[in-house]
Design a protein with these regions (language model features):
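Flavin-dependent oxidoreductase catalytic cores
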Residues: 1-369
């Protein structure tokens, strides 16, 4: 490799977290927890490979936040109870002992729940709008999504509170260094952001600033729960798992509103995920979403994710204004991606069988590491 990859290898401070490099593992749903939401020894081995491989930061797969409506997939881990949170502690301690920091992603499925042991076959969402697309079979889903029921004001207050209590457990009991709110990919907070899935006329719906109220209230609850010193971030995307090509209808003006509002709400970082993060955000030309985030939220840390397993693309996104690069497919194929980069070793191509027929963590995957 003839590229100067040293910018990816420089340390970075995320609030009070000192990261050894600019490389993070992106959150990836692996449905390998116990049926009651406890992380497993297999998950611990899976995550430890990334620490041993040199990643400075690991952002875990989304954990559901309550024993009500938030669970998204069968065998998804939870942060809804003290038992679930405490079961994360050996994993986070092992990562930290290896010099890798860890952030817990917190998730509410909303209308895109494919399995919920607490409310079987039922979903809630901003409005009773049938979700586009079909459930994902590699997460044990089949057929159309259920038509959700519109969430009540009281239930929305519970959602916000549960994000806060889950964040407190993640830091206080599970031992994570920070928390990330899942506001991307078509899940609940993204459903509030999106005009065609949010038809409400109360404080949670209407024009774009009102549709952002759910994210703002959640950020404020999480910040209050973890305090001023703990890093709090939010993941944001245009595309959704059930609506891959979706773009923000308001274009760059909407991006200004979204990024400015999230910054004002008190997050420390925005984690942007796009299929190809270097591409123009809107149309065939123009700035990438990372460039827009840097323009409209200049004081925040920006994490870029999306097709950045090629080092030249990762470097391009640093030049666009990203501070950290989060790898998904690249990390799955090469849990030692940072070590290989440093030593100039070839990277393995992504093997799609890792995520099929079910996207759980496989023994062959761990053996190959």
């Amino acid at each position: 490799m003839n590229l100067d990859t040293s910018p990816l290898q420089t340390p970075f401070d995320l609030k009070q977290l000192s990261l050894r490099n600019r490389l993070a593992v992106a959150p990836m749903t692996r449905v390998t927890a116990t049926p009651d939401g406890l992380p497993t020894a297999t998950m611990q081995r899976y995550y430890q490979r990334f620490a041993q491989g040199g990643f400075g930061l690991v952002i875990t797969e989304g954990s559901f936040i309550d024993e009500a409506w938030s669970q998204t997939y069968e065998n998804q881990p939870g942060m809804a109870s003290d038992d679930q949170a405490q079961a994360w502690r050996p994993l986070t301690a092992q990562l930290q002992a290896s010099g890798t920091r860890s952030i817990a992603q917190l998730q509410h499925a909303g209308a895109l729940s494919q399995f919920n042991r607490y409310r079987p076959g039922q979903t809630i969402a901003p409005s009773a709008v049938p979700p586009r697309g079909l459930q994902m079979p590699f997460y044990r889903g089949e057929g159309a999504y259920p038509i959700p029921r519109a969430i009540t004001q009281e239930e929305m207050a519970d959602v916000v509170a549960h994000f806060g209590s889950a964040a407190a457990r993640a830091v206080g009991l599970a031992g994570f260094d920070g928390v990330e709110i899942h506001g991307a990919n078509g899940y609940l907070l993204d459903q509030f952001l999106t005009a065609h899935t949010n038809l409400r006329t109360d404080r949670w719906g209407g024009a774009l600033p009102q549709r952002l109220e759910a994210a703002v209230a959640t950020i404020q609850a999480v910040r209050a729960a973890v305090g001023a010193d703990v890093p709090v971030g939010i993941r944001v995307s245009q595309g959704k798992v059930n609506d891959f090509g979706h773009k923000w209808a308001e274009g760059e003006q909407g991006a200004e509103t979204i990024f400015g509002t999230l910054a004002d709400a008190g997050v420390d970082y925005i984690h942007l995920t796009e299929f190809e993060a270097w591409q123009p955000a809107f149309g065939a030309e123009g700035p990438s979403l990372v460039q827009l985030a840097r323009r409209f939220a200049p004081g925040l840390t920006i994490i870029a994710n999306g097709g950045l397993h090629d080092a030249d693309r990762a470097l391009q996104l640093l030049a666009h204004g990203a501070d950290l690069i989060a790898l998904g497919r690249g990390a799955l194929s090469n849990p030692d991606w940072p070590r290989k980069l440093e030593q100039g070793l070839p990277m393995k191509a992504f093997d799609r069988s890792i995520l099929g027929p079910i996207a759980d963590i496989k023994a062959s995957e761990l053996a190959a590491a």
